[in-house]
Amino acid sequence: LAVALPAALAVFSPAAFAADVVVVTDSRHPFKTMGGERLIELDEPHRIEAELSAELPNDPEQATAIVKRRLSSGGTDLQRRLASAYQGVTDAWSLGITSLPAVVVDQRYVVYGEPDVARAVARIEQHRRPQP
């Protein structure tokens, strides 16, 4: 019974139903995670670009040199952050997201406006269950 109980409980948890959970939001729409979901913040590219362009001089040549230094000193971590941020924006667009926050399950079901990811997933799972 002790071994069967955790497995039985897992069957009823929202995470057990959802194979792929994506949260699409921005810094103005906080949310409560359930763990394991992918996060796409649509304003992340802008925040990274703001870091790169912070306190640049008015001289275009100096500004260009500083940005190049910042890009090279950021190394692969910065490249990974930029690529991931822009890939997230592309993925949200391809999923057809129209409002924030959005919780997407299995690239098919979407709940808009629910900041609690577990609650959004539970709503989707309730909808997916066979109706009597």
Predicted regions and their residues:
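A short, hydrophobic beta-strand/beta-hairpin element that forms part of a small beta-sheet core
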Residues: 100-111
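N-terminal signal peptide c-region/cleavage motif recognized by signal peptidases
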Residues: 11-13
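N-terminal secretory signal peptides
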Residues: 16-60
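Cleavable N-terminal signal peptides
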Residues: 5-6, 16
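Conserved segment of the thioredoxin-like fold in thiol-based oxidoreductases
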Residues: 52-53, 57-80
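C-terminal partner/receptor-binding element of secreted or periplasmic proteins
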Residues: 113-132
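Solvent-exposed loop/turn segments at secondary-structure junctions
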Residues: 28-30, 109-111, 117
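Thioredoxin-like thiol-disulfide oxidoreductase module
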Residues: 74-97
